[in-house]
């Protein structure tokens, strides 16, 4: 029997179990083991309440980063990137190494992370880089008859909605809608189709519907590939912010407030001299509890689980966000 220690975390209530492989060397962490463990532990019927996925933290393969993040979704599939998860990994590693900023390796890039000024209620807040940003069809991959999809109607997907597609580096399909469309079943129907066998996004895609709230604020709801609807998706909020800035020809460096069912984050963008775009995602990194489970013959059993006071703290922000969103309906 293997005893696995974890930290239950969330970014914008996009929740995960964080497992430090260096602290859990009793397990042979193969890709198959990571997937099976994620499927079992992330089951919402599990005594620990499940999660959207597991963040596996291990040593980096490179000299500079202080660690590496691997993301496995609740269905066992691998996510190339997770912005909400990266904020919690950033906090975990920075606290572990007594640093305020560093680099963390992900599956597609080495990214800057740092401790940031709290967004409110003394909630632990971290800033993480989201990149690389690509628009070409191959990066998603996408087959809708164009090399770059930006604010265009795709009749095969919907006869009225205008879509944009971007990888950051996981793929996102984005459309701006009004409250009537948000209240309909369009998003679930479209996203479910595009995340099953289909000719347009063969690897699936994260689908976000975005509502404008003001010049400096948007609301984002995302159907995540491999998960379904979540309280928030960090890379989706980043991607939607970029598309909004491009549509409105906004100043990239100006922070955009992004509201979601899990709270609020801020996103800024920048373009370097070579024209390469990178995004900065700023939001909470909440540690909900610490505990342990046994993992034996494919069965995951709760052993310990001790809550922290941080979730109650975060709920104050959620309450404020919900009150604000009611005024925008």
UniProtKB/Swiss-Prot annotation:
Q: What is its EC number?
A: 5.1.1.7
Q: Where in the cell is it found?
A: Cytoplasm
The source organism is: Listeria innocua serovar 6a (strain ATCC BAA-680 / CLIP 11262)
Q: What is this protein called?
A: Diaminopimelate epimerase
Role according to the record:
Catalyzes the stereoinversion of LL-2,6-diaminopimelate (L,L-DAP) to meso-diaminopimelate (meso-DAP), a precursor of L-lysine and an essential component of the bacterial peptidoglycan.
Q: List membrane-spanning regions.
A: none
Annotated site, Could be important to modulate the pK values of the two catalytic cysteine residues, chain positions: 172, 224
Name the UniProt key words of this record, in alphabetical order. Amino-acid biosynthesis, Cytoplasm, Isomerase, Lysine biosynthesis
- In the UniProt record, the gene name given for this protein reads dapF
Q: Which family does it belong to?
A: Belongs to the diaminopimelate epimerase family.
GO BP terms in the entry:
lysine biosynthetic process via diaminopimelate
Pfam families on file: DAP_epimerase
GO MF terms, alphabetically ordered: diaminopimelate epimerase activity
Chain positions recorded as substrate binding sites: 14, 73, 83-84, 170, 206, 224-225, 234-235
One Gene Ontology cellular component annotation? cytosol
Pathway(s) per entry? Amino-acid biosynthesis; L-lysine biosynthesis via DAP pathway; DL-2,6-diaminopimelate from LL-2,6-diaminopimelate: step 1/1
Name of the top EC class for this enzyme: isomerase
The record ties this protein, via InterPro entries, to:
DAP_epimerase_AS, DAP_epimerase_DapF
Provide the organism lineage as a comma list.
Answer: Bacteria, Bacillati, Bacillota, Bacilli, Bacillales
Q: Which domain of life is it from?
A: Bacteria
């Amino acid at each position: 029997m293997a005893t696995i220690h974890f930290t239950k975390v969330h970014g914008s209530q996009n929740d995960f179990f964080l497992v430090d492989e260096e602290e859990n060397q009793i397990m042979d962490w193969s890709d198959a083991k990571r997937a099976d463990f994620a499927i079992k532990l992330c089951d919402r019927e599990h005594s620990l309440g499940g999660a959207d996925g597991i963040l596996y933290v291990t040593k980096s393969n490179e000299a500079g980063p202080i660690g590496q993040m691997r993301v496995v979704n609740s269905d066992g599939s691998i996510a190339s990137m997770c912005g909400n998860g990266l904020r919690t990994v950033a906090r975990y590693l920075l606290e572990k190494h007594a640093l305020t900023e560093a680099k963390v390796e992900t599956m597609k890039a080495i990214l800057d992370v740092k401790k940031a000024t709290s967004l409110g209620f003394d909630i632990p807040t971290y800033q993480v880089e989201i990149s690389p940003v690509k628009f070409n069809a191959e990066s998603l991959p996408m087959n809708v008859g164009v090399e770059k999809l930006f604010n265009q109607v795709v009749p095969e997907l919907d006869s009225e909605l205008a879509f944009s597609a971007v990888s950051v580096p996981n793929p996102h399909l984005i459309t701006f809608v009004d409250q009537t469309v948000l209240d309909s079943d369009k998003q679930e129907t479209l996203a479910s189709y595009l995340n099953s066998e289909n000719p347009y996004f063969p690897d699936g895609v994260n689908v976000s519907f975005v509502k404008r709230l003001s010049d400096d604020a948007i609301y984002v709801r995302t159907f995540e590939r491999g998960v379904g609807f979540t309280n928030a998706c960090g890379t989706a909020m980043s991607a939607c912010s970029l598309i909004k800035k491009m549509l409105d020809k906004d100043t990239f460096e100006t922070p955009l407030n992004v509201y979601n069912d899990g709270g609020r984050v801020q996103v800024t963008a920048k373009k370097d001299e070579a024209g390469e775009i990178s995004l900065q995602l700023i939001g909470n990194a909440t540690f909900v509890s610490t505990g342990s489970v046994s993992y034996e013959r494919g069965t995951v059993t709760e052993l310990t689980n001790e809550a922290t006071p941080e979730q109650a703290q975060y709920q104050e922000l959620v309450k404020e966000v919900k009150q604000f969103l009611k005024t925008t309906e």
